[in-house]
Amino acid sequence: MTTTLITGANKGLGHETARRLIAAGHTVYVGARDIERGRAAAAGLGARFVQLDVTDDASVAAAAATIEAEGGLDVLVNNAGIEVRSPEGEIIGAADLTADVMREVFETNVFGVVRVTHAFLPLLERSAAPVVVNVSSSLASLAQAGKGYPGAAYPASKTTVNMLTVQFAKAFPRMRINSVEPGYTATDLNQHAGVQTVEQGAEIIVRMAQVGPDGPTGGYFDASGPLSW
C-alpha cells in the first residue's frame, strides 16, 4: 500500500489529485490548514486528514509525527501555494512589488516546500519507493518569462521551486523528485480564470506521483512531457 500526503488538498488541484490517487489505491492524507474544511474534504474523499500549515514549524512537525506513528510515508505532493494581490485585487508587478509581498509569497510557496520536505525526509527515506512531486507553474520558466502574466513574486517563487527540485534530487538519488506544471487551471488561486478543469490540471501531478524507481528525477514536466526552464 502506498501512503501519500498532499498539502493544500482540501480543494482545487490538491483535492482532485487526492481523489485520483485514492482511486489508484493510495492511502491519502489530506493536509490542510483549516481543520473543519480539511476534515470535511477527507471524509468526502475517503481519505485521512492531518492538520498542516506549511508556514508553521510546529504544525509541520506535528503532522510528520502523526504520519510516522500511523505507518510512514511513500509519496509527498507539495501542492499548497498562494498568489498575493493588491487590496484592489490586481496582480502585483515589479513596479509595485515590496519585500513584504515577496516574503509572504515565498513563505508558502518556497519556505513551505522546504519546511515540509525537510520534515518528511526521514519518513521518505524509509520507503521502498519514495516520491516527491512539487507543483510548479509554466510561469517558472525563464523561457516563458514576460508572456502575458505581469506578476513578479509568484513566478519567482516557482522558479525557485524548480531549482530546489533539482538540488533535492541530486542529494537524494534514490528518491524520484520532480516539479510539475499543471497548466492554467481554474482554481481559487486565479479566481477561477484558468482555462483548464482541475481534472485536466491534476493529470501530470497524479502521473508523477506514481512514477516508479526507474522513472525520471530532477525534472520539470507538464502533461506532454519534459519542459525547459
Regions found by a protein language model. Name each.
Residues 159, 179-182, 191-229:
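C-terminal helical subdomain
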Residues 35, 51-63:
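The beta1-alpha1 cofactor-binding region of Rossmann-like NAD(H)/NADP(H)-dependent oxidoreductases
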Residues 24-40:
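Conserved glycine-rich Rossmann-like NAD(P)H-binding loop of the short-chain dehydrogenase/reductase
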Residues 82-86, 90-106, 114, 118, ...:
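Catalytic loop of short-chain dehydrogenase/reductase
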Residues 6-7, 78-79, 130-137, 176-181:
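Structural signature of the Rossmann-like NAD(P)-dependent dehydrogenase/reductase core
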